Amino acid sequence: MKLLFIAAEGAPFAKTGGLGDVIGALPKSLAKNGNEIAVILPYYDVIDQQFGNQVKDLFYFYTNVGWRHQYVGIKEMIRDNVTFYFIDNRDYFFRGHIYGDWDDGERFAYFQLAALEAMEKINFIPDVLHVHDYHTAMIPFLLKEKYHWIQAYQKIRTVFTIHNIEFQGQFGPGMLGDLFGVGLERYEDGTLRWNNCLNWMKAGVLYADRVTTVSPSYANEIQTVAFGKGLDQVMRMESGKLSGIVNGIDTELYNPENDPHVTFPFSINDLSGKAKNKKELQEQLGLPVNENIPLIGIVSRLTDQKGFDILVSELESILQQDLQMVVLGTGYQQYEEAFRWFANCYPEKLSANITFDIGLAQKIYASSDMFLMPSAFEPCGLSQMMAMRYGTLPIVHEIGGLKDTVEPFNPFDKTGTGFGFNHFSGFWMTNTLLFALDIFHNHKEDWQAIQKNAMSADFSWDTASLAYEKLYMDLKLF
C-alpha cells in the first residue's frame, strides 16, 4: 500500500509530545512490512539546525492562502525506508518553537494547503492519507470540498487520529474564505460550527473516512460528556467509524539490555543489574543508599491533567512511609514549588528535579521500583509502558490508555503488570500505593512475578502497526 502521513511534528526532526513519537515510529514500522511510506512535515528551524546538511532541495511552487501568494519549498530526506518531505516557508516555521504563536491558525492552514498541493507535484498519491490532531484536521474536508476536482485525489481514503481531544483548533469562521479559499456554506449549515467557532477537529471527525484515537478506552471516553470536551455528541454520532489503537514504544530504544543511559544492563532473566542501577541513582541524587527502601519514580509534566493536584494533596502523608521518591519534570509553578518545598523538608525521601533530562529520565525508568502515574485523563500514555520494559511497576489511575496497558495485580491468581485505582482521588491513590508497598516488602515472590509479567508485555510498534495496517487495508477495499 501507498501510505502518506501529514502531521505538525515527528521525531527525530521536531517533537513536543506523543504525536511526535507516533510519527517517528509508526511509518518506520509500516515500511518494514513492505508498504511504500511518505511523511510530510513543516520544515522548522530546529530541523534546519540539526538536519539541514542531510535534506535535499527538490523544487518550489506558490500556493494561495486566501489573498496571499505564498512560497512553498519542498525538501526531502529518506530515513529508515521512509521518505520525509518538508514544507519550507521561513516566515511560518522559523519561529524558534513549533506551537504557541498568535497566527497558528494561518500557519497550519498554509501547511495543510501546501501539503495537499504537494502530493501531486511529488507524484505521491496515496491509497490512504493519515492526518493527526487539529493541525491537519481540515485536510479530509479540503479533499472533499476544495480539491475534489483533481481526479488523482478522488480515490484517496482518509484516516484522522485524535491524540488529545482537548486541543481542537477553534477559530473565527472568516478563516474559511480568508485562508482556505472556500465558502461559508458548511459553517452556516452547522457542519463545521461548534460554540460559534470554526472547529477544525470537528471537521476532521465528520469528513475523514475513519477516525482513531490512541487507545480503545479513550475512544469510549471521548463519547461521554466528562471527556468529550464538547464534541461528545459528534463522537457518538460518528462512533461507527471510530476505533482506538494503543500506541507502541520503540522497544529497541527502551531496552534494559543495551540502553546507553543505563550503567548496569539487566534482563527479564537476570535483574541483578537493576539493583545496582538503583544504588547508583540513589547516590547521584543524594538519597540514602538502601536497596530495601522502595524507590518511586515520576517523569512527567507537572499539570492537573497528570494528577498532580491529588498527589500534592497527599504528599505529606505519603512521605511518612518508608520510601523514597524521585520527581523529574516541569509544569505549573504551584507544583514545581510544592515539590521543591517537600524535597527541602524531606531531603532523605524526596529528590525534586524541576527540569527535563533524557538521560536522567532513562535512569529513573530503569532504577525505580515503582512508577507513579495518577493522571486525571490519559489518551494513551507512554511512560507506563517504558517503565514496564525496565521492570518498574506502574501505579496508575485506570483511565484511557493506562487502563488498556496496565493490568492491576490480582493477589488471588497472581496476574497483573502493575497496580491501579478506579476513582480519581488522593485517598484511593494512596491506598493503592500502600498496597504496592506491602507487596514490595512482604511478598517478594509476587513482586518478582509482576516484574516479569511487565517486562514480557508486548508494546512494540511492530504489533501496534498491524492494527493500523488492517484498518488501512479495510479502507482500501471499501
Curated annotation (Swiss-Prot):
Pathway stated in the Swiss-Prot or TrEMBL entry: Glycan biosynthesis; glycogen biosynthesis
Gene3D superfamilies: Glycogen Phosphorylase B
InterPro entries recorded: Glyco_trans_1, GS/SS, Starch_synth_cat_dom
One GO term of the biological process aspect: glycogen biosynthetic process
Binding-site residues, ADP-alpha-D-glucose: 15
MF (Gene Ontology): alpha-1,4-glucan glucosyltransferase (ADP-glucose donor) activity; alpha-1,4-glucan glucosyltransferase (UDP-glucose donor) activity
Keyword Metal-binding: no
Catalysis performed (reactions): [(1->4)-alpha-D-glucosyl](n) + ADP-alpha-D-glucose = [(1->4)-alpha-D-glucosyl](n+1) + ADP + H(+)
Pfam families listed in its UniProt record: Glyco_transf_5, Glycos_transf_1
SUPFAM superfamilies the UniProt entry points to: UDP-Glycosyltransferase/glycogen phosphorylase (SSF53756)
EC number(s) recorded for this UniProt protein: 2.4.1.21
Top-rank EC class of the record's enzyme: transferase
Presence of keyword Glycosyltransferase: yes
Keywords for this protein: Glycogen biosynthesis, Glycosyltransferase, Transferase
Chain's role: Synthesizes alpha-1,4-glucan chains using ADP-glucose.
Membership in a protein family: Belongs to the glycosyltransferase 1 family. Bacterial/plant glycogen synthase subfamily.
Name assigned to this protein: Glycogen synthase
